Amino acid sequence: MERLEEARKRLEEARRVAVLTGAGISKPSGIPTFRDAEGLWKNFNPLDYATPEAYARDPEKVWAWYAWRIQKVREAKPNPAHYALVELERRILSRGGSFLLVTQNVDGLHALAGSQNLVELHGNLLRARCEACGKRFPLPEAFAPPPFCPACGHRARPDVVWFGEFLPEGAWERAERAFAEADFALVVGTSAEVEPAASLGRIAFASGAYLVEVNPEPTPLTPLAHLSLRTGAVEGMALLLPPSPEDQAEGHLS
């Protein structure tokens, strides 16, 4: 309990906050994770669906899988953990601080919840990217895969980062800078196994940030964390960011 109180106090006083989220934060919204016992990679081989080589071999198969995932995402809604991070951003910015949320998720739920200072490190399922001209465009509610580019008419691919691909231009630099400069770093719902995102917590710790981890299972970050909340994202965020009387009166975190 002492450590939790210390973490709350540090968060209240923090001026530069960086947050990393993974699949665990969207699990309560009904979005499958990848690596736990019920995760996507238990039933699907990532080499068959999430690599440039898989797409080159069988784009129809890959698009059919992504169309299924897109449908799951469109049915999902942000959960209290997403909204808690929106509220945290509001609090930090209202006192003149800086805030950046970096997510490995491609479901778009952080943006839907209202997060503003956001880096989608691995792209977004609800967008496509032209294979020829590189134009990114939102996918319509109903589309027959594969979609085609509205600018040049060429076939488009999912606008996500596959295994073996580079991150979106500028995304990593922005994320790395925020964690290197943070005085408080929060890592929520990630196994901390996928690089380079997994290194962000280590970067923050090495730079002197107070590091908090929220995850049901231990991760490689656990030995470094000043506080590890061994619980789910919704419960962990409620512990870390309880509503103030003012927030309750104004309807924040509802």
Curated annotation (Swiss-Prot):
Entry's cofactor comment: Binds 1 zinc ion per subunit.
A single cellular component GO annotation: cytoplasm
Binding site for substrate: Y66, R69
Location of the protein in the cell: Cytoplasm
Short name of any one Pfam family annotated for the protein: SIR2
GO molecular function: histone deacetylase activity, NAD-dependent; NAD+ binding; protein-malonyllysine demalonylase activity; protein-succinyllysine desuccinylase activity; zinc ion binding
Sites where the protein binds NAD(+): 22-41, 104-107, 189-191, 215-217, 233
Active-site residue numbers: H122 (proton acceptor)
Entry keywords, A to Z: Cytoplasm, Metal-binding, NAD, Transferase, Zinc
Enzyme Commission numbers on file: 2.3.1.286
Gene3D superfamilies referenced in this protein's UniProt entry, alphabetically: SIR2/SIRT2 'Small Domain, TPP-binding domain
Transmembrane segments: none
Keyword Repeat recorded: no
Entries under InterPro entries matching the protein: DHS-like_NAD/FAD-binding_dom, NAD-dep_sirtuin_deacylases, Sirtuin, Sirtuin_cat_small_dom_sf, Sirtuin_class_III, Ssirtuin_cat_dom
Domain Deacetylase sirtuin-type, chain residue ranges per copy: 1-250
Major subcellular site: cytoplasm
Binding site for Zn(2+): C130, C133, C149, C152
Cofactor(s) the record lists: Zn(2+)
Reaction catalysed by this enzyme: N(6)-acetyl-L-lysyl-[protein] + NAD(+) + H2O = 2''-O-acetyl-ADP-D-ribose + nicotinamide + L-lysyl-[protein]; N(6)-succinyl-L-lysyl-[protein] + NAD(+) + H2O = 2''-O-succinyl-ADP-D-ribose + nicotinamide + L-lysyl-[protein]
Family recorded in the similarity comment: Belongs to the sirtuin family. Class III subfamily.
Domain notes: 2 residues (Tyr-66 and Arg-69) present in a large hydrophobic pocket are probably involved in substrate specificity. They are important for desuccinylation activity, but dispensable for deacetylation activity.
PANTHER family reported for this sequence: NAD-DEPENDENT PROTEIN DEACYLASE, NAD-DEPENDENT PROTEIN DEACYLASE SIRTUIN-5, MITOCHONDRIAL-RELATED
Described purpose of this protein according to its UniProt entry: NAD-dependent lysine deacetylase and desuccinylase that specifically removes acetyl and succinyl groups on target proteins. Modulates the activities of several proteins which are inactive in their acylated form.
UniProt-recorded name of the protein: NAD-dependent protein deacylase
Source organism of the structure: Thermus thermophilus (strain ATCC 27634 / DSM 579 / HB8)
Lineage summary: Bacteria, Thermotogati, Deinococcota, Deinococci, Thermales
